[in-house]
Amino acid sequence: RKNSFVFANELDPFAAEAFKANFPDIRMINEDIKQLDKDTIEQMIGEEPVDLIIGGTPCQSFSTVGQRVFDEKATLYEEYLRILSIAKPKIFLFENVKGMLSMRETFYKKDKDGNIVYEVKKNKETGSERKYPVVEGYGRKIIDIIKEKFAFITDDLGYNISCEVLNTVDYGVPENRERVFVVGIRKDLDMEWKYPTAIKADKLSVKDAISDLPVVLENQNITNYTSQPQNEYQRLMRGHNNVITEHYCGVYGGKIR
């Protein structure tokens, strides 16, 4: 089963469909990961040992963009830990946004029955109201908790952990997108991990990436290239296909015009 993928999991149906379109040979389980029990996972894995698990939890709860709110998705890394404890892979890769490095565990006020106390706050711009949990204080950094739990998952399963912030623009992507990568190597293996070296040459710009796209006007949909690729990146992205998808312009209202 060298270089074969056992299964992938995704809750969002649209993301799952996109994954299946791009990776039709990989089994996609489109459901809540919490519903995947130990027996089901072991049955899908089979008898052979697992080499690698790649994943990450929803990034909204860790994002530095916008206002973070109380969100149980922030604790979904515990499901990742559960999968690791079942599959016991040689290596795992956990990825998330840079904001995860600054997020701390949050302690919420509770009533005498142990229920979280909420307060209603009004949005100054829209006037809409929303309930927020009342915060009593903050504790350790989430990243420290995650690294600690990954290092000692069970009494007989642990990983040597390394953590690094990488920027996609340093690896040939025309975008500044920083992400945290946590790599774990099982402690019983004599292996060392090194993160890839950043590209020293000129960074790929958006112009480098999409300057071969034809101009699209309002209420227009273009499905074919009208020019030759202008650099190696554009040739790579096209492959042997001259068809363009999702290259259209909608009809705008008066304010946008």
Give residue spans per PLM region.
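Core alpha/beta nucleotide-donor-binding catalytic domains of modification enzymes
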Residues: R1-K112, V117-V120, K124
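Conserved Class I SAM-dependent methyltransferase catalytic core
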Residues: A74-I185
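Residue-level detector of flexible, active-site-proximal loop/helix-junction positions
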Residues: I33-D37, T168-D170, L217
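Residue-level signal for pocket-adjacent positions within structured domains
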Residues: F23, M28-E31, T57, E95, ...
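S-adenosyl-L-methionine-dependent DNA methyltransferase catalytic core
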Residues: R1-F5, I145-D156, N160-C163, D170, ...
